[in-house]
Amino acid sequence: MKLHELRPAAGSKSAPKRVGRGTGSGLGRNAGKGEKGQNARSGGGVRPGFEGGQMPLYRRLPKRGFTNPFTKHFVTINVDRLNIFDNGTEVTPELLLERRVVSKLMDGVKILGNGNIEKSLTIAGCKLSKQAAEKIVAAGGKVEVK
């Protein structure tokens, strides 16, 4: 078998329904749109959330809360991503960006504790979860809190 000979299993794929192509197809004449009316027209139908003139749900419910403009957004990574560094390396957000562990810095980097770390590293300038800090120290590394 070659790549160009691959085919889906028989019966696993069905052709799309072609509407408005004759009565013999079962979807001719009105093409599944019923008789006249708004929904039978081209571009017909109502917008999402429209309830026929009744006060819609999104307007019946009260407004609540606000978006805090001072929220800090951190890029998160797990400790197992730090195994790419050599023993004794000082890991900073700038180094993580340079080595493409993170794609952007936003308001900083937070290291979470998922996975295991085998290297002895010094972490500087990053926020850490409690588990991540414990794992880094247990591996012989140091944590300099931001």
Curated annotation (Swiss-Prot):
GO terms for biological process: translation. Keywords: Ribonucleoprotein, Ribosomal protein, RNA-binding, rRNA-binding. Residues 1-54 are annotated as: Disordered. It holds the Pfam family Ribosomal_L27A. Residues 21-31, 42-52 have a biased composition (Gly residues). GO terms for cellular component: cytosolic large ribosomal subunit. One of its GO terms (molecular function) is structural constituent of ribosome. Part of the 50S ribosomal subunit. NCBIfam families: rplO_bact. Belongs to the universal ribosomal protein uL15 family. Binds to the 23S rRNA. This is Large ribosomal subunit protein uL15. The lineage of its organism: Bacteria, Bacillati, Bacillota, Clostridia, Eubacteriales. The gene is rplO.
